[in-house]
Amino acid sequence: MKKLEKSKLQSNKTIQISGSKSISNRLLILESLFENIKIDNLSNSQDTQLLKKALSENTETVDIHHAGTAMRFLTSYYSIQEGKTTILTGSKRMKERPIKNLVTALQNLGVEIEYLENEGFPPLKIKGRKITETQVNVPANISSQFITSLLLIAGKLEKGLEINLVGEITSRSYIEMTLDILTKFGIKASFIGNTIKVEPFTDHQSSIIHYEVESDWSSASYFYSFAALGRKTIRLKSFYRESTQGDSAIAKIYEEFFGIKTIFADEEYTITLQPVEGFTFPEKIILDMNDCPDIAQTLCVTAAALKIPFEISGLGTLRVKETDRLLALYNELQKLGTETEITDSTIRSVRFDEPQENISIKTYQDHRMAMSFAPFCLVKELTIEDENVVEKSYPMFWEDLEKILISNITEINVNTK
């Protein structure tokens, strides 16, 4: 457990966040498939390290623990490893996270995949083969990682791949990020309407392609929350003005609703989070976060701390993340004095009361619950349970907080006997 005293924010502190987990995980799959890629500033997140380890080992059974991205990307990756049978498994929670839409798409492409326990869920037994089918239909409202998983192997297929997305597209920005990465490596792709086409990669050049991974905008979101509540300047390194990360939307969102201006220093790839003096907060925040659901927890906590009514939609995918994030938010926001209503894809504030005494935030084995609630320490002392969950995406989070806060962050040892 981490106890965060009621704190103040220091001004003009600079933080270096490691590479984007989303980009790093995509690059690791491409590096393994095409080999002529060198990655700089790779994410130091647990998810990325688990994926890297899985790709480097030649074992029949691969356990990726809580790493949902690795589960999805490796399902497609092992599907094209001709002559190799792989059992892909994970943690208890991973076995509760649906993967049927991706498996069905791969089965329709001719891959033999077997559910070893419950229909539609890991663990999976995958028999790799050469894929000759060229088209597949996929529901558009599923996790973008399912679609990305198919896109990452598409350039390796002899005839490429056409993916027809049926229905309304969810998290489009993450799909576009994947296509941008493919294009940078010379894999031709197009996204017109609801159809994505990826051509087979034929330019097997011998020269090494270097890719510098931009820092992680999802991780940056917590510092936007600190800046919004503490009204002090924070600098973050290795961020690009023209980012392909969907969560870079945090810059516009926090400027509009919380008066945090993002100033880019392009030569240094540094951004400054600058609070606007005399900013008038909105009467209510109404926002569709369909394209950036991973930063919704951060925004809800910021709004709750400032007692700004909010209504956030487009959050259907949060139900099947590391935990049911909407239910987790509903439970933990009550401790901050914020009553909410949730549906399958929305969360709405109903009433603001005073925060509870002795606040202890459950994380539900979800890294984003720990980090999104941490900025509330600028309002009131609180404790974050199971603080080590941050290792999934941001192992240095607590150390970086100590650089920007005027307070003590202490570890509480819990006797579990």
Which ranges hold each PLM region?
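Short, structured segments at the rim of ligand-binding sites
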Residues: 1-417
